[in-house]
């Protein structure tokens, strides 16, 4: 193989899953065993967040955090929080494609593991299984971008970027 072919291969976009692991998990049952005697149907609240950090050149950790809180009336039946993580080797990817890769593709890979771990700990705790629904990480990513843009605009004091004839900033 020639040096030119090696260079071309070295410049190709590269994506590899190095490891998927459960970084942290906690279960709290503050009202057990009494909560098991309740007959009312519980309410369930689910929150999912995504974070990413660079560990080394081209090596990233992505963490999907899921929190499930179940209440019967005003009493917490249980609270589960899990951090499902993965280490990804991502090289030669254009900068504008890196953030969507970390915010959409990687969480999509990790989420089934998170769902399984949360469902498992809930049933092992003696509660009826809760199966988390699928998540559209593309939509979640776009919502985060929109919120960040709105926050940035708010930090600028509501300036629209338009300069008025008197030199002041137009407000929106």
UniProtKB/Swiss-Prot annotation:
Compartments where located: Cytoplasm
GO molecular function, one term: unfolded protein binding
Keywords for the protein's UniProt record, in alphabetical order: Chaperone, Cytoplasm, Protein transport, Translocation, Transport
Region described as Disordered: spans on this chain: 152-172
GO cellular component: cytoplasm
Gene Ontology BP terms: protein folding; protein tetramerization; protein transport
Cross-referenced PANTHER family: PROTEIN-EXPORT PROTEIN SECB (PTHR36918:SF1), PTHR36918
Job description of the protein: One of the proteins required for the normal export of preproteins out of the cell cytoplasm. It is a molecular chaperone that binds to a subset of precursor proteins, maintaining them in a translocation-competent state. It also specifically binds to its receptor SecA.
Subunit structure comment from the entry: Homotetramer, a dimer of dimers. One homotetramer interacts with 1 SecA dimer.
Recorded family membership: Belongs to the SecB family.
Protein name per the record: Protein-export protein SecB
Gene field: secB
């Amino acid at each position: 193989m020639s040096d030119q072919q090696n260079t071309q291969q070295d410049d190709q976009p590269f994506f590899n899953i190095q490891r998927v692991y459960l970084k942290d998990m906690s279960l709290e049952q503050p009202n057990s065993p009494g909560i098991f005697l309740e007959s009312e149907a519980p309410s369930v609240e689910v929150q999912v967040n995504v974070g990413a950090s660079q560990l080394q050149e081209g090596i990233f950790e992505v963490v999907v955090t899921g929190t499930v809180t179940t209440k019967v009336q005003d009493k917490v039946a249980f609270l589960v929080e899990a951090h499902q993580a993965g280490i990804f080797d991502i090289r030669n990817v254009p900068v504008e494609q890196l953030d969507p890769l970390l915010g959409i593709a990687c969480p999509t890979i990790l989420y089934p593991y998170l769902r399984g771990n949360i469902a498992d700990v809930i049933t092992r705790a003696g509660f009826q299984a809760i199966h988390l629904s699928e998540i559209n990480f593309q939509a979640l990513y776009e919502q985060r971008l929109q919120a960040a843009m709105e926050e940035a605009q708010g930090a600028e004091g509501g300036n629209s970027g338009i300069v008025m004839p008197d030199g002041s900033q137009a407000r929106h």
